[in-house]
Amino acid sequence: MPDILCPTCGAALTLGSRQWLCPKGHCFDVARQGYVNLLPVTQKHSLHPGDTREQVVARRTFLEAGFYEPLAQAVCQAARRYGKNAKAILDAGCGEGYYSAQIARALPRAALYGLDISKDAVRLAAGRYKSGTWICGTAAHLPFPSGSLDLILSMFALTVPEEFHRVLTPGGVYLQVLA
């Protein structure tokens, strides 16, 4: 599993009982739902960035109705084909975790990280899907070391090619779905 980096100083974080800590003393609490907020105020462009709770719940209801199930299956098939040896996967812009959970089932040996700028989305994902590491953060400043992720999934989300390239391992896979 790759390190998760402190958004303040860039040092590796260590998971304590309910906190992520860095050697310089920066501390990030794990919420009771199971996610960590690594989005510093300096990286926010609004008071509540990302989707609202209402938007997230509406999307979850829509996705659970099965309308995008064929798309999810196709993405999982691509992940198994191109990322079958992946050890660490990031769903960048994971939303409420629908696609993250599908990828986790498709590649069960890989460590899954879900990241979204919406605290409401990450809260919902972490509350429902316990198998991943859920992070409130931004794709513009990924909290991972260079060359540490084997597969990045971006489903209808903000893409930052330079940042994705930085964190991908050599030969790593980037799967993107656009509307």
Residues covered by each model-derived region:
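N-terminal auxiliary segments of SAM/dcSAM-dependent transferases
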Residues: M1-H48
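Class I SAM-dependent methyltransferase Rossmann-like catalytic core
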Residues: H45, G50-L71
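Conserved class I S-adenosyl-L-methionine
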Residues: N85-G95
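Conserved SAM-binding loop of SAM-dependent methyltransferases across substrates and taxa
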Residues: E96-P108
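Conserved SAM/SAH-binding beta-strand->alpha-helix loop
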Residues: D116-D120
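A short acidic, Gly/Pro-enriched loop at the edge of an enzyme's catalytic core
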Residues: A140-L151
